[in-house]
Structure formats: C-alpha cells, structure tokens
Amino acid sequence: MALGNCTTPTTFILSGLTDNPRLQMPLFMVFLAIYTITLLANLGLIALISVDFHLQTPMYIFLQNLSFTDAAYSTVITPKMLATFLEERRTISYVGCILQYFSFVLLTSSECLLLAVMAYDRYVAICKPLLYPAIMTKAVCWRLVEGLYSLAFLNSLVHTSGLLKLSFCSSNVVNHFFCDNSPLFQISSSSTTLNELLVFIFGSWFAMSSIITTPISYVFIILTVVRIRSKDGKYKAFSTCTSHLMAVSLFHGTVIFMYLRPVKLFSLDTDKIASLFYTVVIPMLNPLIYSWRNKEVKDALRRVIATNVWIH
C-alpha cells in the first residue's frame, strides 16, 4: 500500500454537500426526515409482506428484497452524510471508506439485477399466466435472489480490490458526501485507467441486464395486453407494471448519467446532486411508488390494521 515515501492515509475528509453554515442545519433536518421516511416505508413494507399470506407471491418476494436493498442502501450512505452537517472535521476512516464503497457497489448492483428479475416476473405473469405458478415457484424466486446477490457481491469485490491498489499521496480530501469512485479516482496518485475501465465494463453489464430485459419484457407484455378484450383486464395488467417502469426509469436514468460516461465529463458538484437523488431520494420513493396505487398492498394493510384493532 505504499508508493515510494507515500503511505495510505488512515482517514479521508469528506467535503459534504455544502460549506455554507446557514444551510447545514436545514439540510440536516430535511435529510433526517427523508431517512426516517425511507426506513419506515421500506421496513413497513417488508413487515407487511411477511405477515400477510396474500402477499406471499413471487412479485412480493422480489419487492420485499427491493425494500431491503433500499433500506440498506440508505443506511450505508445517509447517517454519515447527516454527520457531515454537524461535524466541523468531516472524517471517515480508510477502512470505513472502503467498507462504505464495497457496500454501496454491492447494493447498487443488487438493485440493478432485482429490477431485471422483476421485469421478467411481470412478463411471465402476464404473458404466460397458466404456466406462471409452475415457472415462478418460491424455490425458483429465492434461487434468483441468491444468484443476483452473489453476482453483486463478486462485482463489488472486483471494484473494491481495484480501489485497494490505489495510492493517495497528494490529498485525502474526498469531494463528496460519501466514498464513491469518481472523487476517489480524482485524488489518487496512481493510474486509475484500469479502475475506470472496470467501472465502465461491469457497470454497463449490470445496468444493461436490467435496461435490456425490461424493454424486451414489456414489448411482449404490451402485445399480450392489447389482445385482452376487457378494459378491467387491461387496466389490471398495466397497473402491475406502471410502478416497476417508474422505478426502473428513476434508478437507471441516474445511474447511466453517473457511471456510463467518462469520469471527467461533468463536475463533481453535478455528480453530488445526481448521487443524492439515487442514494437518498429513490430509496424513499420506491416503497411509495409500489404501494400508492397497489390495491393488494392497501388491502393487506387494512387487514393487518383490522386484525390488530380486533385483538385489542
């Protein structure tokens, strides 16, 4: 971990979102509220799916894992970001930075693959309804979940191993509110060409796995739905897909902007805003998107509330 007289720093300094002291406390309160809503919404959805047997279906198994990923995602990033609003010296240990980066890549990759699997699930449910119970069994669903987490883990391991080989001799100030690759590459004393290539190749594969799977699935879904004669049937089929399309668009639109482009094409301040959206805001929006117009989730919530009221 040394290069000549250069030794790896024991800590990094995070620049945070802003240096304006007047904005520190208002931003702290805003993002604390967002983080609280994120945890309550995602953990609440996980609990609801767990206790209501009507939601023990493949679609909700994947949604439960998406909620877990979003809650973990937000927890990896937000608490440290909140601390930067309150601390004068915004430090994170070298080990803490590496662990944060590893967790961040793991969860980002997991979400990409989860969205792809959810698109395939909707395709089978709508285009092959009679075969759906046989194809998407609980065992198959959990194997898919285990497989995507394993792939995400390997992806994160590759990127983190590359990061561990970099030296940071000239600066330890990370111009960001968390340890992401772009600001770390900016202050590296070593060549980051291989790292940037790995980010592009692996990032493209994980993003495209979802970006390609989703449109292909929805082409077949649309072709199937237009043949449905009843308006109620068409509405029910499309209503289960709308939430997924919104989640995919929000997540991948930001990720493509962030990672599938040359690192120096935009300023780090622009990256901060984009990062803020998909690491803090999207994890809050996802459970709301999937629950807002979802009759099954609303009915399950009513049953749970009614049961608790009756018991008490």
Swiss-Prot record:
Glycosylation sites: N5
Transmembrane segments: 27-49, 58-79, 101-120, 140-164, 206-226, 240-260, 272-292
Compartment(s) of residence: Cell membrane
UniProt KW keywords: Cell membrane, Disulfide bond, G-protein coupled receptor, Glycoprotein, Membrane, Olfaction, Receptor, Sensory transduction, Transducer, Transmembrane, Transmembrane helix
Domain of life of the source: Eukaryota
Gene Ontology terms: cellular component: plasma membrane
CDD domains named among the record's database cross-references: 7tmA_OR5D-like (cd15410)
A molecular function GO annotation: G protein-coupled receptor activity
Function comment: Odorant receptor.
PANTHER family: OLFACTORY RECEPTOR
Name of the protein described by the UniProt record: Olfactory receptor-like protein COR5
Organism per entry: Gallus gallus (Chicken)
